[in-house]
Amino acid sequence: MPAWGALFLLWATAEATKDCPSPCTCRALETMGLWVDCRGHGLTALPALPARTRHLLLANNSLQSVPPGAFDHLPQLQTLDVTQNPWHCDCSLTYLRLWLEDRTPEALLQVRCASPSLAAHGPLGRLTGYQLGSCGWQLQASWVRPGVLWDVALVAVAALGLALLAGLLCATTEALD
């Protein structure tokens, strides 16, 4: 390979991995995208990940939760290894559970919970709603907005109006008979 080819390859690799989060190591893939290896660095939070991340290794850290939407900006993400972390398996882990369930359901049995006591040592994929705790507040938060509440109020008023109209019609037809 000519010297300019080697220099170009070196430049392309450096350019592709320049957004690599510390303390992780990154490797450019031949088919575009990045291999991001953050294993064993004692991370307690997710680092800022490059949008081109295709394979993400987060095993053997100190992660306990994943914020909702943490992987939404990673459209190429195919592989996610989050094993060997002290996961706190409650409602805050719902996003991670659903993400894995949609993409790599077999990984759910490899991810083990460290806490709370109801879920400790069990695989994330086998937890029941009782073990996860009450997640109802998270589900409500997505639809409780001022516009939605007005819509619900209008539907309730319309239903009440229809019920009154039906009652009035029944009373009128009985009076005519």
Swiss-Prot record:
Kindly list the GO CC terms recorded for this protein.
glycoprotein Ib-IX-V complex; plasma membrane
Implicated disorder: Bernard-Soulier syndrome: A coagulation disorder characterized by a prolonged bleeding time, unusually large platelets, thrombocytopenia, and impaired prothrombin consumption.
Give the organism, scientific name. Answer: Homo sapiens
Q: Which residues lie on this side of the membrane: Cytoplasmic?
A: 169-177
An example of a Gene Ontology BP annotation on this entry? positive regulation of platelet activation
Query: How does the annotation summarize its subunit structure?
Result: Two GP-Ib beta are disulfide-linked to one GP-Ib alpha. GP-IX is complexed with the GP-Ib heterodimer via a non covalent linkage.
Give the main localization category.
membrane
Name-wise, this protein is Platelet glycoprotein IX
Other comments on record: Platelet activation apparently involves disruption of the macromolecular complex of GP-Ib with the platelet glycoprotein IX (GP-IX) and dissociation of GP-Ib from the actin-binding protein.
SUPFAM superfamilies assigned: L domain-like (SSF52058)
Cellular location of this protein?
Membrane
